[in-house]
Amino acid sequence: MEQIQTSPIFLGFSSQKGGVGKSTLAEIVSSILYYEKNIHLFVVDCDLSQDSFYKLREREKACVESDPQLSKQMKQHFFSLKRTAYRILKADPKEAIEKANEYIRKHPSEQFDLVIFDFPGHAGTSDLLQLSLEMDYILSPLEPDVQSMVACLTYIKAVNDLGVSMSSVRIKEIILLWNKVDRRVKNTLIEYYSRYIMVETTFICTFVRLIILIKL
């Protein structure tokens, strides 16, 4: 796939198990980086579900436009931020990189720092695995249960196996994050799962890093 010399960082949010908060995390991270940290970015939504990034933005837009008072408040809010809302593009996984690079080429003055990709809920097809290899970094949330861990390790192994068969790949790290942790669950269980994942990934992949999102 085509890459440009001044390409920004490509950050993907991916998960093999639905309902772990992938899209929610992607939206939170995008908003914090853009509105609070002044990171110039746009989002490519590859998730075609009803709760996708793009469809959520469309629903929010319709809600604001239908209420004059809310519309006025939002204009004042963005004026105070001195920023407009970040752009969200919708794309099929197979065309996501091409569409992102095309948008970057058409807006050279924007000088984007980051492009965030919200992957579909299940990244098991060859197109989605290929898209994974085109990322610089992937954030993959997981829950402290066996099903989530097995799905996560299977995904990592698939990305690694495909990557080593290619002459060059872009991916640098897959960062695993504990999410939706039940605070009633003992720390020892999370620590055990963390050690287990680190041991398993040592044998199947060399670019995986595990971090703990929620400290109990």
Language-model regions: role of each:
Residues 2-8:
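Phosphate-binding P-loop
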Residues 108-127:
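Glycine-rich phosphate-binding loop used to anchor ATP phosphates in small-molecule kinases
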Residues 30, 34-35, 132:
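Gly/Ala-rich phosphate-binding loop of Rossmann-like dinucleotide-binding domains
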Residues 180-216:
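Beta-strand-loop-alpha "switch" segments that mediate conformational coupling across diverse proteins
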Residues 152-168:
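Conserved C-terminal guanine-recognition region of P-loop GTPase G domains, centered on the G4
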Residues 4, 14-20, 35-114:
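P-loop/Walker-type NTP enzyme "switch/lid" segment
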